[in-house]
Amino acid sequence: MNNYKSDFLNHINERGFIYQISDSDKLDKLFSEEKITAYIGFDCTAPNLHIGSLMQILLLKKLQDFGHTPIVLIGGATSKIGDPSLKDKSRKILSYEDINNNVKGIKKVFEKFLDINKIKIIDNSKWLEELNYIDFLREIGSHFSVNRMLSFDSVKQRLEREQNLSFLEFNYMILQGYDFYKLNTDYNCILQMGGSDQWGNIICGIDLSRRLAGKELFGLTTPLLTTSSGQKMGKTEEGAIWLNFISEKDNHSTHPRDFWNYWRDKTESDDVGKFLRLFTDMPLSEIYEIEKLKNEDIEKGKELLATKITELVHGKDSDWKSKKRIVFKKKEFEKGYGLLSLLSHNDLGLAK
C-alpha cells in the first residue's frame, strides 16, 4: 500500500478508495499544499442512484470533510447519448422529459450525503447544448486520436466481442473530456474522480486540457464495487439496489428492509472488512478484529455492516429494523429455539 504525504490521499487509500492516479506524486504534493477542486460526473439514466454510485458519493463527502471543494457534475446532456464504458450493448435512448425528471430525482440523493451549501452542482447542458457542431469538430475533435480512443477498454472490449458501438456512443468520451476542460477553465477544477471504468474518459480530458491550454490536470479512479469472487454488487433478480426510498411501488426504489437484507445476504465473508472500510467510519483497528472472525462468527460482521450502511443511507430512524428478515444459525435451528429466545436474538420484543 502506498504512503501519501497528504491527509486526504492517505485517508482514502487506507479506506480502499484508490485504484489508479494519473500522477500520484504531483497530486499528493498539491493536496499537501493547497485546497483543490475536484469533480465526479453522474449520468441521469434513472430518477435515483444505485449503490454502485455510493462509493463515488462518499468520496465527494470525504473531499468536502478534508476542506476541499467537490463538484457534482450532472450529465443532463451526455445522458442523451449514453456512456458505453464496459457495457455489453448500447443504452436505451431516453426522452428529454425523462432526463429532466431524472436530474431532479438524483439531486435529492446528494442532499442526503453532502452539505449542499458547500458544493457545486452543475449540469453539463450548460455548455454542451450551446456547441456548434462544426466549430466543435474543428476546435476540439482535432485534438483526439481515434487510434488511441480505440485502445481504451471501454471501446476495445465492445469491438473484440463484435458488439455494435454507435457513432453516438463513440462521441461520449470526447464530450466527457470537454467537460473536464470546461470545469477547469470555469471553476479551476484540476481533478476528475470516478470508477475504474472511467479511466479512458478521464485521460481524454487530461490530454485535451494539456493540448488546448497547457494545463496539467489529474485523474483518480476507485475500484468497481465487486465481491471477492468477482461479482458486481448492486443488482438482484428484481433489479438495482437504490439509494433513495421513494415508495414500494416505485421501480426505482428499494425499501430500507430490503436494503439491509441485501447487504446481510450478498456480502461475502472475505469482503466484510473491505466494505466496512469503504462505507463506515469505524476505526481500522476495530475492522481488523472483525476480519479475524471465521465461519459462523463472521455472520455477525455481516449484520454489523448491513446495519451501519443502512443507517448511513436511510438513517437510524427508518423502519428497516422492525422488518428485517429473522436470521439465526443452522445449529441453533437444529437444537430447537424457543419463541422468546428467537425474538430476543433478533432484537424483537412482545408488546404488553
Predicted regions and their residues:
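Conserved nucleotide- and phosphate/pyrophosphate-binding catalytic cores
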Residues: 208-352
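NTP-dependent nucleotidyl-transfer catalytic core
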Residues: 1-198, 202-206, 213-218, 231
